[in-house]
Regions:
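NAD(P)+-binding Rossmann beta1-loop-alpha1 motif at the extreme N-terminus of oxidoreductases
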Residues: 1-50, 59, 99, 117
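Internal alpha-helical scaffold of NAD(P)-dependent oxidoreductase catalytic cores
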Residues: 98-103, 119-151, 163-201
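A short glycine-threonine-serine/GTX helix/turn-capping micro-motif
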Residues: 153-161, 210
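Rossmann-fold NAD(P) dinucleotide-binding segment
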Residues: 47-102
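Residues at the starts of beta-strands that form the adenosine-phosphate
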Residues: 3, 26-27, 83, 103, ...
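NAD(P)-dependent Rossmann-like dehydrogenase/reductase catalytic/cofactor-binding core
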Residues: 16, 189-250
Length: 250
């Protein structure tokens, strides 16, 4: 059994605890000073505590906001035989490494870790097979150079919010057309899920898949013409760019 301490049980840390908690091979200690945060993951961790000194496991996940990294690290007495997985956006591996004796790997995950559908980017440096296996228990991991972590933060870290926004737009259009809100949400969300699965499993390019759905003079091509003539792709690119810039600023 692999023992893991998760320091910080907010949105991202909580998703990690819940994701790992679904696997019997992980013994998880959830650490957070906030009682409500601890209670939110109590059913998924073998133990919860407010004491950072409890972070004695071989793998420690640091899941706190960027401005809390420094003070939290001061309270963690990690050793050279531990690995620290830092999830803080915009905080460099070197910044963290200078403040701990543990081996450091920088990871940008997303909230889908809770459901085993996470897309994560991890730095080459510090990424052991044990940590890779841990991440893969919650989804997919791409190993990247740290210079690419800011754009990865925008694509897979912030990306779920962009997709949620698009799902809601499709859902709203369905409701305006007469669908029941629950039906519209289910159909929209499952359509995005199915489209993503197709992209991952089909050998065709995204453009080829679009063509496969667009029959001449059909309904899809009519809708695609509207998207092609709009600035939708530019708006998405701008959103990713803005998130990347913010990651560099933090």
């Amino acid at each position: 059994m692999t023992r893991v301490s998760v320091v910080g049980c907010g949105n991202m840390g909580g998703a990690f605890v819940k994701g790992l908690g679904q696997h019997d091979e992980y013994d998880v200690t959830a650490i957070d000073p906030d009682e409500t945060a601890r209670e939110s993951v109590a059913d998924n961790a073998l133990r919860t505590t407010a004491d950072p000194a409890a972070a004695v496991d071989p793998i420690v996940v640091l899941a706190v906001k960027p401005d809390l990294v420094d003070p939290v690290l001061e309270g963690l007495d990690l050793t050279a035989d531990q690995t620290l997985v830092t999830l803080a956006a915009g905080v460099s591996r070197s910044f963290v490494s200078a403040r701990t004796d543990a081996t450091v790997v920088r990871v940008m995950p997303n909230l889908a870790a809770e459901f085993g559908e996470m897309a994560a980017a991890a730095t080459h440096e510090g990424l052991s097979e044990e940590v890779r296996t841990l991440l893969e228990a919650m989804g997919t991991v791409a190993e990247v150079d740290e210079s690419l972590m800011d754009v990865a933060t925008a694509v897979n870290g912030s990306g779920p919010a962009f997709v949620f926004y698009l799902i809601d737009a499709v859902k709203t259009a369905g409701i305006e057309g007469g669908l029941d809100p629950t039906q519209a949400e289910r159909l929209a969300a499952q359509t995005f899920r199915g489209a993503a699965a197709t992209v991952l499993r089909d050998d065709r390019t995204v453009d080829e898949l679009v063509d496969a759905v667009c029959s001449p003079n059909g309904t899809t091509i009519e809708g695609m013409e509207v998207l092609w003539e709009s600035d939708a792709d530019r708006a998405v690119a701008d959103a990713v760019g803005a998130a990347e810039r913010r990651s560099r600023e933090i």
